[in-house]
């Protein structure tokens, strides 16, 4: 297997989580703005 795969996968997972959190905050702000 590829030794760096788990570390890359973890980094990708962290990036996805951060993006989701940002989207949730933006949507929440828009909903509160409405």
From Swiss-Prot:
Biological process, per Gene Ontology: respiratory gaseous exchange by respiratory system
Signal peptide segment: none
InterPro entries linked: Surfactant_protein_propep
Cell location: Secreted, Extracellular space, Surface film
One Pfam family it belongs to: SP_C-Propep
Chief location category: secreted
GO cellular component, one term: extracellular region
Keyword Secreted among record annotations: yes
Protein keywords: Gaseous exchange, Lipoprotein, Palmitate, Secreted, Surface film
Residues anchoring lipid (S-palmitoyl cysteine): 4
More details: Pulmonary surfactant consists of 90% lipid and 10% protein. There are 4 surfactant-associated proteins: 2 collagenous, carbohydrate-binding glycoproteins (SP-A and SP-D) and 2 small hydrophobic proteins (SP-B and SP-C).
Function: Pulmonary surfactant associated proteins promote alveolar stability by lowering the surface tension at the air-liquid interface in the peripheral air spaces.
Protein's name according to its UniProt entry: Surfactant protein C
Phylogenetic lineage: Eukaryota, Metazoa, Chordata, Craniata, Vertebrata
